[in-house]
Amino acid sequence: MAFLIQSRQKFCVKNRLGLHATPAAMIVKIINKYKEIGVWVRHFDEQVNGKSIMGLMMLEAYCGTELLFIIEGGSIADQRTLIGELKELFEKKFFEE
């Protein structure tokens, strides 16, 4: 019997322009490196696929918005690496400032 490994991580949008097309594409590019991992992103009652640029943009995440990333599948090591890459991206404000 296989168990689905799930991690959850919150990130705060810190860049002035929020989650527009370029940051959304950066997130999707990172997530797509991990083929066996599924990612959902939640903001209040909205939940979208983390591999969808349009879905991420539909969250209307402005500066100061907190997003919950739900990461499923793959190995624990891959999930931790993915979280680390996303953390760096959010902390560096998507390299916009």
Report the location of each language-model feature.
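A short, flexible low-complexity segment enriched in Lys/Arg and Gly/Pro that occurs
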Residues: M1-F3, K29-K35, E96
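Catalytic strand-loop segment that frames the active site of acyl-thioester-processing enzymes
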Residues: M1-N15
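Long, contiguous binding/interaction regions
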Residues: A2, Q6, T22-A25, K51-M54, ...
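A generic structural signal for short beta-strands and their flanking turns/coil linkers
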Residues: I5-Q9, K35-I37, C63-L67
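Compact, glycine-rich, soluble single-domain proteins
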Residues: C12-M54, M58-A61
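C-terminal structural segments of small proteins and small subunits
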Residues: Y62-E97
